[in-house]
């Protein structure tokens, strides 16, 4: 049996008004060993929540389900508000079995394109031709697309991308930009 004794992840997305009213104008993502997918998802979601709140507090409240969904969809443990509202109680710790949740798998990050119109990625987890994946944009809506082609650095076609950190060129049939994140939703 795996027993954990660790803190829950800090999540203040529902408390943006209090943070802004307190004069906080900079946020830091805590934790070592967070993936680029986690950092990109959290940074994009907080940026949108703050912008929405400053534009119109009603818009911020209206979009709360979207913010919570985005934060919950990246790799996370349970959430806490930490020390913001006083000393945390025992509920801020995880004492039982592993509650680690992973709804999306980080597949890679786009690093540009080549003369053929294929997009260069540094792959992180396996994916295959024919699979539907999601492109997470730094700004804007996510896009679902099918992997049409995978080409290695030597120009050889591949049916799958099984080697972490391998540099590949892919075609998803839709335009991508540098720093787009590729991810796959996992079955529950």
Model-predicted segments: where are they?
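Surface-exposed amphipathic alpha-helical tracts and adjacent flexible/coil segments at the periphery
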Residues: 4-188
